[in-house]
Amino acid sequence: MITRLKKLPFKLPLVLVAIILGSISMLSFKAAKFRSDPYMVQIPGGSFYMGPSDEQVDMAMVNRKKLVSITGFWMDRTEVTNQQYRKFVKYVSDSLKYLAVYAGGVNQTEDTVKVDWNRALRINTNSKAVIEKLNELLLSPDNRIQGKVEIDPTKLIYRYSYVDLKAAAKSSKGLEQPLSNFLVSQTEAVYPDSLVWMRDFSYSYNEPFTRLYFSHPSYNHYPVVGVTWKQAIAFCHWRTNNSNFYLDKGNKKDEKIDGIYRLPTEAEWEYAARGNSKTNNMYPWGSPYTRTKEGRLLANFKPGRGDYFGSDAKNDNIYTSKVQSYPENAYKLFDMAGNVAEWTSSVYYEGGNNFIGDFSPDLQ
C-alpha cells in the first residue's frame, strides 16, 4: 500500500513528484483477505514509458524514456493530510506519556513494554504528580511562553525496527544467520518542521501558517508539509502497525495486511500519476493543456510571475489547496501534479533510467 506524504509547502510549476506510502501486490492482498482502505485505490499492473514526456525535449539529454513494467499496488487517493499525520504525532505523544508515567522512562520501547491504551488515554496532565514524571518530555522552564507547561515537540521520538532484507540478500549465508544480524533500529523525531513556511518563502509574511497550518482544525484536510524523508518512512511503519493493531483488537487477524504501507518508488509514482495514459503527455490529465475549456486551472500551481490566481475567479489557493480540490486522474488519484512536492522511496540519480531494471525498477 502506498501513502502520499508532502515535503514542501509551496506550489510547484506542475512537477510530477510524489510521496506514496506502502504498496502491496494485488496477489498479496487477496491472500490476506485484505479489506482495502477507503482512502486508497487499486492501481493495476502494466507497462509504460518512464521518463521525460514528449514535450520535454531538454530533459531527454539527461534521462531518456524507458519502457518498464509495474506490478499492481494500492495507493492513497490524496496526499497525507494534517489530520492524518496529527494522529501519528498524538500516538507518539500518548505512548511516551504512558512510558514516562507507568514504565519508568521514555527510553523504553514497545518491544519491551506494551502500552495499555485504556490507561494511557486517561493520564491527567494537570496533576502535579504526573507533571513531575513527564518532566523529561516537557519544555524546559526557560523555553516556556508565559510559563505554560507544554510537551517539547523535539522530544516526540518514534522508535521502531525492521529487517534489512537487502543486506540479508547480499550475504551468501543470509538464511543461515540469526535475524538479529539484519535487524535495524531507528529513532525519529516526528513533529513536522513548521518553520518551512518561513524558510521557503523569503521576504514574505507567513507567520500565521507557521503557527497554525499543522495544528488548526481549519487545515485538517490540507496536505501535511515540512515532513522529512525519514519522518515519512516512520509514518509508514506506524500506519502498518496501527492498522494491524485494530484488526487484532477486532479479532480480524485473518484480514491483517500481508505487506506494509510504504513510500512508492519513483516508477510506481510516475506510473500512477500518468493515469493509464498511453500518450506520454506531460500532465496527469492526459493533455498538454493546463486549463479546462472554461479557463479553470487543472492543478494548484503558479500560472505566472506574481500571479497565483491565473485569472481564475474561483481559484483561491494561494498556497496549498485542500485535497480533492482539483479533478482526479484516470486512476481516481488527486493532485498528481501541482500543489506540493511529494516523497518517493527512490534516490534521484541523473541518468538513472539508463541502467535501472525494466521490471518494477527502483534506485536506492
Language model features by range: what are they?
Residues 7-8, 12, 133, 295-297:
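Intrinsic disorder/low-complexity segments enriched in polar/small residues
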Residues 8, 13, 31-34, 59-61, ...:
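Sterically constrained small-residue positions within well-ordered secondary structures
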